[in-house]
């Protein structure tokens, strides 16, 4: 396994740990999710370039679309929650009350 893949897996694991450890603020959770998506995108793109199959070129583009949708929805929720509650603390939110 090349050092690039090891570094990308470490970046994914550190982003996952950041998501688990720093889940008190919504903004830090969104940043960790973006780090996970970026490391997955780079891994999939580099593996698609190594296999040189036409079907594998579609997967990174699909991941970019899902990543952009995830970022847009996350930022919209962050703005809505910060305007409604005045903070981005996840503990203060009760999603069952809407």
Curated annotation (Swiss-Prot):
Q: Give the protein's function.
A: Core subunit of the mitochondrial membrane respiratory chain NADH dehydrogenase (Complex I) which catalyzes electron transfer from NADH through the respiratory chain, using ubiquinone as an electron acceptor. Part of the enzyme membrane arm which is embedded in the lipid bilayer and involved in proton translocation.
The UniProt entry lists the main location of this chain as mitochondrion
Species annotation? Nephelomys albigularis
Gene Ontology cellular component? mitochondrial inner membrane; respiratory chain complex I
Write one Gene Ontology MF term.
NADH dehydrogenase (ubiquinone) activity
EC code(s) of this entry: 7.1.1.2
Which family is this protein grouped under? Answer: Belongs to the complex I subunit 4L family.
**Which reactions does this protein catalyse?**
a ubiquinone + NADH + 5 H(+)(in) = a ubiquinol + NAD(+) + 4 H(+)(out)
Q: Does the keyword Transport apply?
A: yes
One Pfam family assigned to this protein is Oxidored_q2
- Where does the sequence pass through the membrane? 2-22, 26-46, 61-81
Could you tell me the keywords of this UniProt record?
Electron transport, Membrane, Mitochondrion, Mitochondrion inner membrane, NAD, Respiratory chain, Translocase, Transmembrane, Transmembrane helix, Transport, Ubiquinone
Note the topology in the membrane.
Answer: Multi-pass membrane protein
Can you say where in the cell this protein is located? Mitochondrion inner membrane
* Source organism superkingdom: Eukaryota
- The answer to whether the entry has keyword Nucleotide-binding is no
Top-level enzyme category: translocase
The entry describes its oligomerization and partners as: Core subunit of respiratory chain NADH dehydrogenase (Complex I) which is composed of 45 different subunits.
Q: What is this protein called?
A: NADH-ubiquinone oxidoreductase chain 4L
Which GO terms fall under biological process for this protein?
A: ATP synthesis coupled electron transport
